[in-house]
Amino acid sequence: MNRQEREFLNAVNAAVENWDYSYEHYHEWDDFCVDITIDDMDEWAENESDIWRALSEVADEWGAGIDSDCNKYYLGIQFS
């Protein structure tokens, strides 16, 4: 993992540090991807909009793509 990827991962983790979550990061083609799962479904349901907002702010700041499916969030970024 290079410095930019580490900084992006740190920003993503900081955005969701208030919630119980797990994550994985990997490379897919030219993208660096981070998948976030909010582990507690009740916590996710109570905070869904706040979680989306926090991760969207990181995505906007870094120029990353973001998507979600229930309590899972997918972020991807391409570093040149």
Regions found by a protein language model. Name each.
Residues M1-C33:
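An N-terminal amphipathic alpha-helical segment
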Residues D20-S80:
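Acidic, low-complexity, intrinsically disordered interaction modules
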